[in-house]
Amino acid sequence: MSSESPLLEKRLSEDSSRYLRLQKWANMSSADALGLEKERPEEKAAAAENPLVFLCARCRRPLGDSLTWVASQEDTNCILLRSVSCNVSVDKEPKLSKCRDEDGCILEALYCTGCSLSLGYVYRCTPKNLDYKRDLFCLSVEAVESYTLGSSEKQIVSEDKELFNLESRVEIEKSIKQMEEVLTALQKKLREVESKLSLASRGS
């Protein structure tokens, strides 16, 4: 048990940080069916400009995005989306929910079409007090990674600038000069060969 403890603590830490990352965006998202507080205009603009893409944690296929975000559930460690991508397959065999406070909920399991990773479930039948969950896709935070659109923009600009800094320019000019010297030497040898061939043809 003691040898498993560090691994368990590491997994819990990873899951917590992943959930907090998704929850951070949730705090900026629009009000959902649970009656979350409405966001300020600047928060709404920020969320629209930098939406999240949710990826399969195993094969990195896109599963959905934050534009279809409805809510996050801390008790079940999952996020609720209105729709998902074609990379999510639905097992049509209905199952009863085993989660606390979800008695009477009928679910269908969700899997990644690329790697068959279990992603969560979709609510197909719910009691009246949980009607807001019906037909929503519940993705487990453990099975989801996220990518913020535009997050690599600064890095790309930095790389572009790096290509044209003074040091790189000197190296490029040095390489061009070396290539010119090689071409000049090859042209000289080519002329010598052509001259010898010309003399040989005359002698014959």
UniProtKB/Swiss-Prot annotation:
Q: Which Pfam families match?
A: Yippee-Mis18
Question: Which residues take part in binding Zn(2+)?
Answer: C56, C59, C112, C115
* InterPro entries noted in UniProt: Mis18, Yippee/Mis18/Cereblon
What does UniProt give as GO cellular component? CENP-A recruiting complex; chromosome, centromeric region; cytosol; nucleoplasm
Positions bearing Phosphoserine: S13, S16, S17, S204
Where in or outside the cell it occurs: the entry states: Nucleus; Chromosome; Chromosome, Centromere
Q: What keywords tag this UniProt record? A: Cell cycle, Cell division, Centromere, Chromosome, Isopeptide bond, Metal-binding, Mitosis, Nucleus, Phosphoprotein, Ubl conjugation, Zinc
Q: Which domain of life is it from?
A: Eukaryota
One GO biological process this protein is involved in is: heterochromatin formation
Q: Which GO terms describe its molecular function?
A: identical protein binding; metal ion binding; protein-macromolecule adaptor activity
| Cross-link Glycyl lysine isopeptide (Lys-Gly) (interchain with G-Cter in SUMO2): residue positions | K133
- The keyword Nucleus is assigned to this record: yes
The segment(s) forming the Mis18 domain are: 51-149
Q: Which residues form the signal peptide?
A: none
Family, according to the entry, reads as follows: Belongs to the mis18 family.
Function in brief: Required for recruitment of CENPA to centromeres and normal chromosome segregation during mitosis.
Q: How does it assemble?
A: Homodimer, and heterodimer with OIP5/MIS18B. Identified in a complex containing MIS18A, OIP5/MIS18B, MIS18BP1, RBBP7 and RBBP4.
Name of the molecule in the record: Protein Mis18-alpha
- Organism, per UniProt? Mus musculus
